[in-house]
Every structure is written in C-alpha cells, then in structure tokens.
UniProtKB/Swiss-Prot annotation:
The name this protein goes by in its record: Ferrochelatase
Binding site for Fe cation: 202, 283
Record pathway: Porphyrin-containing compound metabolism; protoheme biosynthesis; protoheme from protoporphyrin-IX: step 1/1
Gene this protein is translated from: hemH
HAMAP family reported for this sequence: Ferrochelatase
Length: 339
C-alpha cells in the first residue's frame, strides 16, 4: 500500500513575465523591474538609472500598453498560455506519480506570479524539492541566467534549504525539434509553402555575445536542425533576430531589415516563426504578426504569415514532460510506485 503523501515535489514552469494589465502604470511597473535587472541591461547602474527614469519610463509605457491592449484577452496571452501549459503538465505528472502528489506551477522572472513569491508559498506548504524548468529553449544570461539569479537570491534568505534542480535549456532536444518541424508542416498543409521561411529569434546586444553568451550559437543550431528535419535547401530559409532596443548594436541579421530587403528584391511570400518563444506574447503577436507583416508588404511583398509558437500543443507538453519527469522521478524514485 503506497502512502498518501502531501505534495512535496513542485515543478515550476518559469517564463519571462508580463504586465498585470494593459495600462501605462502597469506596464511602467513591469518595465522598471525588467529593465533594472543587470542581466538584461549591462550598463553602469548609476548611468542606466538616469536613462531609465528620465527617458525610458516617462515615454515608453504608454506606447507599449497600447500594443498590449491590442492582444489582451482577459489576461496577457503569455500568462494565459503558461497557465494552460501548467494545467496540462500537472495532469500528466500527477497521473504518472499517483498516489504521490507532484504539482506544477507557473512563475515569472518579472511581474506576477513572481518566482520568489511562488517558492515562498510552496515552501510553506511543505514542498522540499523544486524542479525548475525555464521555458527558454536557448539559454542566455539575459533570460535563463536571470532565473538562476532569482533562485540564488531566494536561497540566501533560507535557513533550511530545499532540493533544487534546474533545466538549463533544450535548444537541440529531439522532441523540441520535431515539435517545431511538425507545427510548420501542419501550417504549410493549410497555407502552402512560401518562397522563404524565416526563423526569427529575440535578439541580444552584440557585446553580450562577444563576452561569451552562447545564445546566438544555440539559436543557429535550433534553426539548422529544424531546417534539416524539413529538408529545406540553404536558400529556402534564414535565421534572424528581432526586438532590438536602444542604439547599441545587436546580433544580426535584423528581422525587419531582412524582410524589407526581401520585399524590395522581389520575394513575394514569407512565413515566419520564433522558436525562442514557448508561448505567444507581445513580441510574436504584435511585433512579428502585425508590425513586421506591414514592413514586408509595404516593401513589395505579397503574402506574409506568422506561424504560432508551440503554446499548449500536445507535442509541446510531451517535450515539457520528457524534460521534467526524469528529474521528478529521480527524487520520487526512492518511493515505490513511480510509473
């Protein structure tokens, strides 16, 4: 007879974050937290505080809030999708571990629900092992690195530390590559094949890459493996980088610049996806699906389609389960009965 144990193992799906509502004050709070992280902005703290508070925060929140409002559906798409991913993965792990109770929870690096708050709550409920799964397929110090930082800062305040395990990234995981390739195949079965397929990843400043951030190489590896899985020729696809911020040089080529060049050079049809995002968000639904579409069509292009992120696709949950279940099992394996 297996003991009926309380939930002691928690899997945390950690995404970047989102404002609480599509208003300028909420966006300002979110941006201040996000852009104050030295992992994100590597500028001397005193100098950046002046730029952030005198130039960025007085002007940017209103415009960003308007963009969020255009895609808001009761809550931000990222949080809605993350919550669905949590529910689906929780059900799967609960079925495998029954009667041992393994719970899955959402957390954010910035905004709500904040990672430290989630960990505090779960710790008070008796959780003594955390499996951290940042849903950033390609590691960067600006994303997954910030999760490590948050875990470390939280740990410094604990006297009785829990066990903690973290998945660094999964840029070349076979299930991830297959899920991306299959999502493209399904999309093209409906919309046909384009002249060009663009893999657009969120960018980082070039100096970050120069200092050793492996993110660009991981992005290129992901795109190349998916292209290989699809049997694409070298001239049928490209990798690019989006969402640059400020005047600093970012890793290239830039998504919007390539799209404009393609439109002017006679390329008529493009399909674009962003494998860096595990859930659709402002950068995909507004920037890629709307802004960059206008850029391409205005430059002379005729057909432009955005291929959605993996979101709550069953194949995506298969991937999340494949990465988290062995780590949970490794801890629960001392208990008889893990499936």
């Amino acid at each position: 007879m297996k003991p009926d144990l309380p939930p002691r193992i928690a899997v945390l799906l950690v995404n970047l974050g989102t404002p609480d509502e599509p208003t300028a004050p909420a966006v300002r709070r979110y941006l201040k937290q996000f852009l104050s992280d030295p992992r994100v902005i590597e500028i001397p703290k005193f100098l950046w505080a002046i730029i952030l508070n005198l130039f960025v925060l007085p002007s940017r929140p209103k415009r960003v809030a308007e963009a969020y409002a255009s895609i808001w559906d009761g809550d931000s798409p990222m949080r809605n999708i993350l919550n669905t991913q949590v529910e689906m993965l929780d059900k799967r792990l609960a079925e495998r571990a029954a009667p041992f109770r393994v719970s899955v929870h959402a957390a954010m690096s910035y905004g709500n629900p904040g990672l430290p708050d989630v960990m505090d709550k779960l710790r008070s409920e008796g959780v003594d092992h955390f499996v951290m799964l940042p849903v950033f397929p390609q590691y960067s110090a600006t994303s997954t690195g910030a999760v490590y930082d948050a875990m470390t800062k939280w740990s410094l305040k604990q006297r009785n530390l829990p066990n903690m395990t973290i998945v660094k990234d999964y840029f070349a995981h076979p299930l991830y590559i297959k899920a991306l390739a299959d999502s493209i195949r399904r999309f093209q079965a409906i919309h046909g094949k384009p002249e060009k397929l663009m893999f657009s990843f969120h960018g980082i400043p070039q100096p970050y890459a120069d200092k050793g951030d492996p993110y660009p190489k991981r992005c290129k590896c992901t795109a190349a493996q998916v292209a290989h899985e699809l049997g694409l020729k070298p001239d049928e696809w490209i990798i690019s980088f989006q969402s640059r911020f400020g005047k600093q040089e970012w890793i290239k080529p830039y998504t919007d610049v390539v799209l404009e060049d393609w439109g002017k050079s006679g390329i008529r049809s493009v399909q674009i996806l962003s494998p860096a995002f595990s859930a659709d968000c402002l950068e995909t639904l507004e920037e890629l699906a709307i802004e960059n579409r206008e850029t391409f069509l205005k430059a002379g292009g005729e057909e432009y389609h955005y291929i959605p992120a993996l979101n709550a696709d069953e194949a995506h949950i298969d991937l999340l389960e494949a990465m988290s279940a062995p780590l949970v099992k490794g801890w629960a394996g001392t208990l008889d009965g893990w499936a």
